């Protein structure tokens, strides 16, 4: 390893162990000493706070006016029911919210499979228990599910809503993150004669709405995008060569391939001559859904990937495309 004193080892993905459908262990090595904790902690925080997902945000239960009450014929009180509803693992395709309905009668458990929904909604854990009915009683409720990011307490949404919110519409603390548990461990690694290196092992469990490997990839992409701003600091050290602020965000000038979309989605965009991210963000959802072979699942994937980079569909870009790209389009 002569001559590499000032060079950093470049880590490589060593192994992805799929423990089950919702849990995986990702091993990354070799890392310079100390970088195991640096990268592990950063990825852990992003996975817990920044992964987009879907969650229950509002519930209306027939005969219930507030959460500090109970319903006749139901074993659980309303607070327990709301807590159980937070455990629903749901995905929505092609839109940002959906209304689900539940009606059940007769003694026995009420589970997620009893919920009625349209084809745009998928409930990943249909056996999840919501409550238990006793005797010949019934329960009916309407459940609002929304797409979001991070954790949004009900109190925060209550402050922004109008005072005319109907009595009986119960707000739920929404945890949108599909990552249920994340932990990392740093072990010793060796390359040739060096024994002071790190091996990073990330152990992650999701709620089933996202593949653990995909979650790791998205979190790493988010981290890399955020660090781009620090890379650009080198331009500030050359005041004599100070240039005007670029007309467009550099990310808009990147090819669509950098989004690492599925093959189906990428091919659909290429067929529509959407070559750059700047081309893509100017399209609306309606326009993309008119694209042959591009369905709601692909649309949802595109929206999530753009959201992870602080972008969205339907943006307006004046003077697009720039001269540097005009010849290529």
Curated annotation (Swiss-Prot):
GO BP terms, alphabetized: DNA-templated transcription
Protein keywords: DNA-directed RNA polymerase, Nucleotidyltransferase, Transcription, Transferase
UniProt keyword Transferase present: yes
Chain intervals for the UniProt region annotation (Alpha N-terminal domain (alpha-NTD)): 1-234
EC numbers for this chain: 2.7.7.6
InterPro entries the UniProt entry points to: DNA-dir_RNA_pol_insert, DNA-dir_RNA_pol_RpoA/D/Rpb3, DNA-dir_RpoA, RBP11-like, RNAP_asu_C, RNApol_insert_sf
Domain of life according to the entry: Bacteria
UniProt KW Magnesium keyword: no
Subunit description: Homodimer. The RNAP catalytic core consists of 2 alpha, 1 beta, 1 beta' and 1 omega subunit. When a sigma factor is associated with the core the holoenzyme is formed, which can initiate transcription.
Recorded family membership: Belongs to the RNA polymerase alpha chain family.
Free-text comment about domains: The N-terminal domain is essential for RNAP assembly and basal transcription, whereas the C-terminal domain is involved in interaction with transcriptional regulators and with upstream promoter elements.
Protein name listed in UniProt: DNA-directed RNA polymerase subunit alpha
